[in-house]
Amino acid sequence: MIEVTRLNGTKLLINPHLLELVEETPDTVLTLTTGRKIIVKESRQDIKNLV
């Protein structure tokens, strides 16, 4: 599990096996294999290092 932070400050644990796509637009958007999108504070590089 990786810990990320939503823009409102809420901490969230995500199963890294569910990550399909990580985009910076300029916010970092995580797209899960379920189709759900989550906007987080961490950069694309931070997510890459966590996975």
Regions found by a protein language model. Give the residues of each.
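A short beta-strand micro-motif
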Residues: 2-6
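Acidic, Ser/Thr- and proline-rich intrinsically disordered linker/docking segments
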Residues: 7-12, 20-51
